Amino acid sequence: MKSELPEPPEHPKSIVFLGTPEAAVPSLRKLVEAGFEIPLVVTMPDRRRSRRAAPTATAIKQAASELGLQVSENAAEALEVGADCGVVVAFGQLISEEILSKLPMINVHFSLLPKWRGAAPVERAILAGDETTGVCIMRLDVDLDTG
């Protein structure tokens, strides 16, 4: 049985942002432009694009650095900064129930759920020949794209 998760506040002031790819960068920039305090940005670790290449920072890590924001690769650190809630955009990993039980989160998913749950929803919609798609914004749940 799932535990009851906290509701995001109606008017948050401080937001932890969790995201990884280029597709998440506009959301981060808009939150900053709108005046939200972003005490922490959480992203996936730097990755090599090939065996011989040096590790490359994620697009979100690069954008956060340009914006002067603190970056971490550890989602648990989101609990340490006193934010009102978290916003998740294409983060790339599930958020633990321990974190969700203490910090309400909102997820932005690039499909009309429940269709194309999981990774690469835009690409999968194109490959399937979908003529209509969209974006879902939902309270994050412990399961994948089910909030």
Language model segments and positions:
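N-terminal Rossmann-like dinucleotide-binding module
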Residues: 2-51
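Short beta->alpha connector loops
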Residues: 20-23, 76-77, 91-94
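Short acidic-hydrophobic, aromatic-tinged amphipathic segments that line or gate anion-handling sites
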Residues: 70-74
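Donor/substrate-binding cores of folate-linked one-carbon enzymes
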Residues: 14, 34, 85-147
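Short amphipathic alpha-helix with an adjacent loop that forms part of the alpha/beta core around
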Residues: 75-84
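N-terminal beta-loop-helix "entrance" segment that forms/cooperates
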Residues: 45-65
